[in-house]
């Protein structure tokens, strides 16, 4: 489990680090863009005020003359030829003397008083048409020249084509943005960044880009994000390959058990005469992540040698109970479910409790749970062992001796333990052919079982000759490729649904 998590954690850390670095770079880039945009807006305002400054020079020349129709026409022409100017007003001793509008009209409801600056933002309430304006002032002795600039031109100058930023013009303590009226800050400064004009008394203020922006990452760095993700996945893949290569077979098997890669296969047990389904033997298979299965012959000996056979069997028990409960209503009464148990598992302190919990996890109580004792390891038969198996037998478990005759002390087990079934190994059944000599050993085994009143299950039935021999000798329970090979749970469900439910009677 640890070796599985490390590549994943490394990949996550690499991806997060890469995203963090990319985000910082994009943030600095966005800050530079915002600053460049503010300078661009300031430059736009400078150009507008440059027009206003030039217009005041013309107005000064007119102020030295008479304010007649010709002079008003000249003022109007000056205002019209300057694309960003609205009106020009000449004041003498604080009184409107001449304007660029006919009849010396002004669009101000009152003449404002300028602070210590030549710029002033007038709110909509101070204008006739209720639109805010920017005023530029130039003072010559007792003559004041006022130039008004429409809010549309100011907003246009502030409208820099950058997403996510709002530029605001600040004059003294008043501000105007791309929308809305003139506002007074009154000591409250919601904007943290600013660019000062080097020519006029105004400032472009704005807020910096957010430190983290998912939209910015996708919009500006999508390609790099994909590259970072590929690098992180490649690192995880290489680490996983490294750990798998350097891990011992035992560690690899332990990881497979923890990851649920050891799954149950089911080989049906049938009535050899009728072909009816009587039960299943649970067999372990190692499911590969990329498809395919590994035979138990490749990993069961390692599991027994390393002690992993116990957690492996526990995992199978949990899976079998869950799967059988899902189709419990489809199983015939007395259906056999057999699981192999090694000697090391049987002598473990928790074995009896595990088996009882296994039984209690089934929703049906009329199933025959078969404990198949394997002979691959020697089993030390003592009083404690006999007591354990007797407890399980009394609680409804059926005890079977698997692969009889191929392992350790099979005959002594028959003498010392309460055995309900012996399962004749396929190596004996496989010898059966037309030659009478081929069945001598098997005949002896069958005769022994009958004398001890022990039922028999024949494994490895593959030919019609073997089937006929077993039926002639009244061996009811049979399993092998002649009937069914070991199948997945899904295939077992299909088999069960295709067969009528028949009560299983022990014969």
UniProtKB/Swiss-Prot annotation:
One GO BP: regulation of single-species biofilm formation
Example GO molecular function: cyclic-guanylate-specific phosphodiesterase activity
Catalyzed reactions per annotation: 3',3'-c-di-GMP + H2O = 5'-phosphoguanylyl(3'->5')guanosine + H(+)
Signal peptide: none
A cellular-component GO term for this protein: plasma membrane
EAL domain residues: 246-500
Broad class of the protein's primary localization: membrane
Localization of this protein: Cell membrane
Protein EC: 3.1.4.52
Membrane topology (UniProt): Multi-pass membrane protein
Known role: Phosphodiesterase (PDE) that catalyzes the hydrolysis of cyclic-di-GMP (c-di-GMP) to 5'-pGpG.
Protein name per Swiss-Prot or TrEMBL: Probable cyclic di-GMP phosphodiesterase PdeG
Encoding gene per record: pdeG
């Amino acid at each position: 489990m640890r070796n599985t998590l490390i590549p994943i954690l490394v990949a996550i850390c690499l991806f997060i680090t890469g995203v963090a670095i990319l985000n910082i770079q994009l943030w600095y880039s966005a800050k530079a863009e915002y600053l460049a945009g503010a300078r661009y807006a300031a430059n736009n305002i400078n150009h507008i005020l440059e027009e206003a400054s030039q217009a005041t020079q013309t107005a000064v020349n007119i102020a030295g003359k008479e304010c007649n129709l010709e002079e008003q026409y000249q003022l109007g022409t000056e205002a019209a030829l300057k694309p960003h100017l609205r009106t020009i007003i000449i004041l003498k001793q604080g009184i409107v003397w001449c304007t660029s509008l006919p009849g010396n009209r002004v669009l101000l409801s009152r003449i404002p008083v300028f602070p210590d600056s030549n710029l002033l933002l007038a709110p909509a309430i101070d204008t006739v048409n209720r639109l805010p304006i920017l005023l530029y002032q130039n003072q010559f002795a007792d003559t004041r020249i006022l130039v008004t600039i429409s809010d549309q031109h100011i907003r246009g100058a502030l409208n820099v084509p950058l997403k996510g930023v709002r530029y605001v013009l600040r004059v003294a303590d008043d501000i105007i943005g791309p929308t809305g009226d003139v506002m007074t800050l009154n000591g409250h400064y919601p904007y943290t960044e600013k660019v000062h004009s080097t020519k006029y008394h105004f400032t472009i203020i704005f807020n910096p880009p957010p430190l983290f922006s998912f939209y910015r990452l996708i919009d500006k760095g999508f390609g790099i994000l994909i590259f970072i993700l590929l690098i992180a996945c490649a690192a995880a893949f290489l680490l996983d390959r490294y750990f798998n290569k350097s891990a011992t077979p035992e560690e690899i098997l332990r990881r497979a058990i923890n990851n649920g890669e050891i799954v149950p296969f089911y080989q049906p047990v049938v009535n050899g005469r009728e072909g009816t389904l009587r039960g299943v033997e649970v067999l372990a298979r190692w499911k590969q992540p990329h498809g395919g299965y590994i035979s138990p012959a490749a990993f069961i000996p390692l599991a027994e040698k390393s002690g992993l056979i116990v957690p492996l069997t526990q995992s199978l028990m949990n899976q079998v109970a869950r799967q059988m409960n899902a189709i419990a209503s489809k199983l015939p009464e007395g259906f056999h479910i057999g699981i192999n148990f090694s000697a090391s598992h049987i002598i473990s302190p928790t074995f009896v409790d595990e088996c009882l919990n296994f039984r209690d996890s089934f929703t049906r109580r009329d199933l025959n749970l078969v404990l198949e004792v394997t002979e691959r390891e020697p089993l030390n038969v003592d009083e404690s062992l006999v007591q354990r198996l007797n407890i399980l037998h009394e609680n409804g478990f059926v005890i079977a001796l698997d692969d009889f005759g191929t392992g350790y002390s099979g005959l002594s087990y028959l003498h010392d333990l309460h055995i309900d079934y012996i399962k004749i190994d396929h190596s004996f059944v496989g010898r059966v052919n037309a030659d009478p000599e081929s069945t001598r050993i098997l005949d002896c085994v069958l005769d022994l079982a009958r004398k001890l009143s022990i039922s028999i299950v024949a494994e490895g039935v593959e030919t019609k000759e073997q089937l006929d021999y077993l039926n002639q000798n009244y061996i009811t329970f049979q399993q092998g490729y002649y009937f069914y090979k070991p199948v997945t749970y899904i295939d077992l469900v299909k088999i069960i649904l295709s067969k009528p439910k028949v009560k299983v009677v022990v014969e």
